Amino acid sequence: MRKTLLLILFFCLGVQVWAQFPKAIFPGDYPDPSILRDGKNYYMTHSPFYYAPGFLIWHSTDLIHWEPVCRALPEYEGSAMAPDLLKYQGRYYIYYPTSTGENFVIYADNIRGPWSKPVKLDVKGIDPGHVVGEDGKRYLFTNNGWITPLSDDGLKVTGKSRKVYDGWEYPANWVTEGKDMYLESPKLLYKDGYYYMMSAEGGTAGPATSHMCVVARSKSVFGPWENSPYNPIVHTYSASENWWSKGHGTLVDDVNGNWWVVYHAYANGYH
């Protein structure tokens, strides 16, 4: 039996504060969270996989109590996963891949809908993460450190992809899903002159200690990317911990300037 939960952890771009956190906010099967702060409101969605309608969007004003507001993907379009929910120039977007190996985007002028039909993007990879570069152009990161340029409306690819990040090399003796780093889930933000990218490594469904969240920063979306000396920011070090396979996180700031990371995990023994 698998029991995936979403958890929240207080985070300070380098220093973790562990008081009453981490705290489970979504007990149940809600993997691959993506969270957005829009003024005093927070919105979040997650992987629907084979469920339709998909991309259930949740709303909160305190990051702890949530209520559903809409489903952004009304019809089944293949197993949809690992979304990136964002707002850019007044419009909301969800970028996501499917089991077909393709990437799509949907958009809406109101987060409660109506949402557009999926627009196919000519980009390979999984777990897309949107960012606006230092040149004012829009880009999409995908797994394994690749970046692809987008059109101004964010609905088309305008150039070739290139690799700009190699990930954080975790210790060779750590027990993870396999020999591959499984560098995925790039989620980006810009703060005080730096781009920060939180990524997942180690594999999602491997041993209890496999998954993790790592952070790198750069002055440019094209790098060089400097890995945090505090990596991994989130990780299960032992199968004796309450939460297994913690990872796939998204950073978000609250209205008071505090920073948090929302990520998924398995309850101990329910993997």
Q: What do the PLM-derived regions correspond to, one by one?
A:
Residues A19-H271:
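Carbohydrate-active catalytic/glycan-binding domains of CAZyme proteins
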Residues R2-K3, H271:
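Short glycine/proline-enriched turn or capping motifs at secondary-structure junctions
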Residues K3-L13:
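Sec-dependent N-terminal signal peptides
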